[in-house]
Amino acid sequence: LRLVGSEMCIRDSNYTIQTYKKNETIYCEGETPSHLMCLISGKVKIFKDGVGGRSQIIRMIKPREYFAYRAYFAKQDFVTAAAAFEPSVVCLIPMSAITTLVAQNNDLAMFFIRQLSIDLGISDERTVNLTQKHIRGRLAESLMFLKESYGLEEDGSTLSIYLSREDLANLSNMTTSNAIRTLSQFAAERLITIDGRKIKIIEEEKLKKISKIG
């Protein structure tokens, strides 16, 4: 995006940099949004607490992605919460500055419309996947989702994010015990290998097939 003159001044004079420790809360459900956030480094989860205290992970944020602005544009309080998966650095820009920029810059307005549209499409697809697929399909879909979101390590097969079994369960809309059991089944079938929290994808096409058929 090309921001010129006063627009650059507004952005550059207003941003702050905040660091978050692993598992530290970035914002809470019910809070009033005030800043656009951009993840500079680290990994962030957007989640919602559900029945019985079990969380559902809604989205995963990777570096250079923007978040925490939908509720502001909708004139709502946050309906989700955000926390750092690992030590993370976030850039915060006041939404008051963003609304000024949007009013002056059509490209920036279209950028946010496009991002909101992409996020809505991803949300719609995951809602269907997590409600209609069986446990094996949901876990396989989550593993592919993590690969697409964060990529692989230098070996070309190990996921570049190490989730706890609880987080993987929350991402897959299942209990932790079901996540552990299904991971073990995938490992026994040589679809993956497991080393602590490290998951190596061995048979990606078979996992994609399991995800597709649900």
Predicted feature locations:
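Polybasic "coupling" helices that flank or enter modular domains
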Residues: A103-N173
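Cyclic nucleotide-binding regulatory domains
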Residues: E24-E86
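Single conserved hydrophobic/aromatic residue that forms the stacking wall/gate
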Residues: L1-G5, C9-I10
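Phosphate-/nucleic-acid-contacting segments
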Residues: E148-G214
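Short aromatic/basic micro-patch
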Residues: R2-L3, M60, A84, L92, ...
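Cyclic-nucleotide recognition modules
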Residues: R59-G121
